[in-house]
Amino acid sequence: MTVSNDTVDNAKATPELDQPWEELGLKQDEYDKIVGILGRRPTDAELTVYSVMWSEHCSYKSSKTHLRYFGETTTEEMASKILAGIGENAGVVDIGDGDAVTFRVESHNHPSFVEPYQGAATGVGGIVRDIMAMGARPIAVMDQLRFGPADAPDTARVLPGVVSGIGGYGNSLGLPNIGGETVFDESYAGNPLVNALCVGTLRVEDLKLAFASGTGNKVMLFGSRTGLDGIGGVSVLGSASFEEGEERKLPAVQVGDPFAEKVLIECCLELYAAGVVVGIQDLGGGGLACATSELAAAGDGGMVVNLDNVPLRAENMSAAEILASESQERMCAVVSPDNVEKFREICEKWDVTCAEIGEVTDKKDTYLVYHNGELVVDAPPSTIDEGPVYERPYARPQWQDEIQQAPEIARPESLVQAFKDMVSSPALSSRAFITEQYDRYVRGNTVKAKQSDSGVLRINEETSRGVAISADGSGRYTKLDPNMGARLALAEAYRNVAVTGARPYAVTNCLNFGSPENTDVMWQFREAVHGLADGSKELNIPVSGGNVSFYNQTGDEPILPTPVVGVLGVIDDVHKALAHDLGGIDEPETLILLGETKEEFGGSIWQQVSGGGLQGLPPQVDLANEAKLADFFVGNTSVAASHDLSEGGLAIAAFEMAQKNNVGVDLDLSVVHEDALTALFSESASRVLISTASDHLDGILQRASELGIPAVVVGTTNDSGNITFAGEEVATAELREAWSATLPNLFGHAVGANSVVE
C-alpha cells in the first residue's frame, strides 16, 4: 500500500481546501502568515512542519521578546566564559585549562501527567541528547519535580511513575543522579512539573554546533528507527493546557529505550573523535521536522531531504507523520561525502542504524522535502525556524497587593511539636524514598550527592578538578513577588554550590508558567526574567541557556510561577569539597551561623505547615551577601561541615546536619533572634550554618568579619543524641524517624503508579 501525499503541486491546484490548522495548535493569523510566506496553501507536510516549529515549545514566540533581556544584561566579562549560549542545544562554558562544561534543564511536564513513566523517562533521554549534540560526554543528571498535594489520589498515580521513569532511564544509561528537589502543592495537581538537568564535559576544541554547511555535504540520520510514537508531541502537548475531563493524549507521548541511547552516546563520541561530523542536531521535540529545518536555517545554503530513505518501524507512514514523529534516541549529522563511509563504519560497529536522507545545497534558504518521489515541502527554512514573535499584554494582577499583606504568624504551643511537624511534613521530609531509586555513584566520579546541598563530580582524574551543580526554585516565593522569587531561586542555587567550596560559574534555567495568554502570567514571567537576569549580572555569572514551559495549568488555574534555576560551580580539588554532616571530626564542633536572621515568614514552610496559606512578602535577598559567602568558602580548609539555610530555616539545617551520625546539638537561639520561633524557622536568605574545631574558631570569625559577613556562635555538638534549644529538648533519632516515614507511608503502596490519565 502506497501512502497518498498532499504534494506541492496539489496544494497549488486546490487552494480552497480546508485544513486542520487549528487542531495542530495554530491560530488563524499564523495560518494566514504561512499562506503569505508560501504564496499558496501549505501541504499537509508543510502545515505539520510549521505547526511544530511555531509551537511555544520550539519557537518561544511568547517569551522571546522578554528573553532578550538576558543578552542585554550580559557583560563582556560574563560573555567571555560562554562558548555556546542561548539558542543552542545547551549552554557551554569554558572553565579553563582547555576544559569545557555543558549543562541545561529541560521540561517534560505535560507528557509526564499523561503517562508518568514514559513522560519522565523520555524527558531524561531528551536532555541527555541535548548535551551529546554539543560534542560532550554526559556525566550526570538531576531532576526538579513538582506534584499536587502529597495525599491526593492522582499524586499517588503520578509520582511513583515519574520517579520510576527517571530512575529506569538514567540508571540504564549509567549516569549518576546527583541531586534534585521534590515539591508538593495544590497548584500542581493535574499539571506536575518534571524538569530534568544534564551536565556533560568536553575539551574546548571538541565543541559541536547545529548547522548544515558545505554544498554537497550529506545529511545522515542515525539511531533508532522512526515510528508513530510521539506524533504531535510538541504542538498537541506543548501548546495546550489540560481541561477537566479532556480526552487523554497518549498517542503524543514518546516511548524511550535507554539501552539504545547508551549505545548512541558511545557512537556519537567515536564519530566526534574521528572528525567526521560537520554539524550535529538531536531529534527531540518536533522530530525530523525540527532537526532538519533548524540545521538548514543555521547553514549557509539550503537542504534537500528524501523521506524515502528514513528507516521506519511502522508501515504506511505519511510524510507529515515521518516529519513530526518524536521517536526517541535519534540524531542527525551533516557529513562531508568523503567521510560518509567512515561514518557508516562507526555506526555499524555500534550496531546503530544510519541512513543518508539528504544533502546540503548551494540554494540559500531553501528546504525541499520529498516522499514517494514527490515534492511535499518547499519552504524557506528561515521562516520555519524564526516563527512569529508575540508582544503579549501583561499587567500586575489586582490581587498582588492583597496577597502581599503582612501575614499573621501562627504561634505553636510547643516548639518541640512544631519541630516534629516541620520535619515530618511532605514539604521537608526525607526524599530517600525517591532518591534511593536512583544510582548516585555509577561511573565512580560522584563526590557528593546524598543529603548534599549540591552534587559534586570529579571531571579530571589526574588533577581531581571537579564541578558542583545545584538546581532550586520556589513557586511560593515567586507568586508573592516574581522578581524576588527568581532572585531567591538564583541565590539558593548559588549558595548551595558555594557551601561545597566551589566557585559559582554559570547559570541555566527552566521557566515554568501558566498560559501566556493570561496577562497576570505574562507579568509574572517578565518580572521573573528580569529578576534572574539582573541577579546574574550582580553576581557576575552568565546565563548560558534555558527553557520555557508555558500552559502549565488545569482549566483556568495556573501553577505557581516556578522558575527553576541551575548553577554550575568549579572546584579545583574535589577531595577538598566541604562536608555536609556533623560528627566528621574527632572532637566537639562549634556551630557558627553566617548571615542575618529577620522575621521573614512570607511563603515559608512554617506558614504552609501551620495552615497560614500563602501570604506576605518573601524573604528579601541582597545578592552581594551571596557573593561574600562564596568568597568565604572558596579555599577555606577550617570548616568541618556546612549547610545552607533555606526551607525550614535554622532548625531544619541543624537537624539535617546532625541526623546521619546521630549527633547531639545544643543551640543558643538568643544570639540568632529575640523570638525563638523566628530563630528556628525564619527563611531569611544569605545564611549558612557551619561547624569547626575549636582551634579554628577565631580564624573563621576573623575571615567572616573581613568579608563583612555577620557571624555568631550558635551552639556546640555533643554525644547526647539530642537537639536542645530554648529550654526544650528532642531526640535526633525521634526526629529522624518522623522525617523518614512520611513519603513511604504516602507512596509505599501506591496503586496504578504507571497508569495513564483517563
Swiss-Prot record:
Binding positions for ATP per the UniProt entry: 60, 104, 509, 546
Positions of the catalytic residues: 57, 108 (proton acceptor)
Gene Ontology biological-process entries: 'de novo' IMP biosynthetic process
Amino acids binding Mg(2+) 2: 130, 282
UniProt cross-references to SUPFAM superfamilies, sorted A to Z: PurM C-terminal domain-like (SSF56042), PurM N-terminal domain-like (SSF55326)
Protein keywords: ATP-binding, Cytoplasm, Ligase, Magnesium, Metal-binding, Nucleotide-binding, Purine biosynthesis
Pfam families, per the entry: AIRS, AIRS_C, FGAR-AT_linker
Swiss-Prot/TrEMBL catalytic activity: N(2)-formyl-N(1)-(5-phospho-beta-D-ribosyl)glycinamide + L-glutamine + ATP + H2O = 2-formamido-N(1)-(5-O-phospho-beta-D-ribosyl)acetamidine + L-glutamate + ADP + phosphate + H(+)
PANTHER family hit by this protein: PHOSPHORIBOSYLFORMYLGLYCINAMIDINE SYNTHASE SUBUNIT PURL
UniProt family annotation: Belongs to the FGAMS family.
UniProt protein name: Phosphoribosylformylglycinamidine synthase subunit PurL
